[in-house]
């Protein structure tokens, strides 16, 4: 849900009329690889446009972030006229949000783990599901995510992600990640706190506006 909320924060910054549903579908698409039965981390690196030599979960400094960022910008510049622009913008927003989150949230968390690594990662995953469901519940008071995603137009990005996998991801989100999670103890979470995640959404939105929309999107249109 954080990616969807970041995309919503930015939708009017593009100064063009967007097909909202396709834009939102684009922003959940990079993680569609999780819906593949033979999922491998290399598939996620490809869908997230990792430059050669970068590894998922190991973007922990400014140098790696900059290499990843340039790969994303170059992909946009080279493909902006080849694919549905609403879908592509949503896709790029997701990737740029991950660049920001890797450097400002995930890396500090991983680097600061003191104790059992596997236990902390399991706690992170569990808390992340809960906070996403919390945001989903709030979002659902005004909008129907099921309808939005099904109205969007999925596309295949050649060599990156397929339309069929994106369609499976919609089902996976609605049947698992956004099922009813017990969030009665969400205020006690230690890693993925609501306030911190809200700050992350705002920070990522400002970051994307500055380094892509203001400085690159208009130039690259």
Residue ranges and their predicted role:
Residues 1-221:
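N-terminal leader/auxiliary helical segments
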């Amino acid at each position: 849900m954080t990616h969807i909320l970041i995309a919503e924060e930015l939708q009017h910054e593009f100064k063009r009329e967007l097909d909202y549903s396709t834009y939102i579908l684009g922003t959940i698409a990079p993680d569609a690889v999780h819906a593949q039965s033979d999922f491998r981390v290399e598939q996620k690196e490809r869908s997230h446009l990792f430059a050669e030599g970068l590894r998922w979960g190991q973007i922990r400094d400014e140098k790696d972030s900059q290499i990843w960022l340039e790969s994303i910008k170059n992909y946009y510049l080279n493909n902006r006229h080849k694919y549905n622009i609403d879908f592509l913008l949503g896709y790029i927003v997701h990737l740029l949000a991950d660049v920001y989150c890797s450097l400002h949230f995930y890396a500090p968390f991983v680097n600061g783990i003191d104790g059992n690594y596997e236990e902390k990662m399991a706690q992170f995953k569990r808390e992340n599901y809960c906070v996403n469901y919390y945001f989903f519940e709030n979002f659902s008071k005004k909008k129907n995510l099921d309808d939005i995603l099904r109205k969007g137009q999925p596309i295949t990005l050649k060599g990156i992600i397929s339309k069929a996998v994106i369609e499976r991801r919609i089902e996976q989100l609605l049947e698992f990640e956004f099922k009813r999670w017990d969030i009665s103890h969400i205020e006690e979470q230690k890693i993925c706190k609501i306030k911190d995640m809200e700050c992350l959404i705002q920070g990522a939105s400002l970051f994307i506006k500055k380094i892509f929309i203001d400085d690159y999107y208009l130039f690259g249109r």
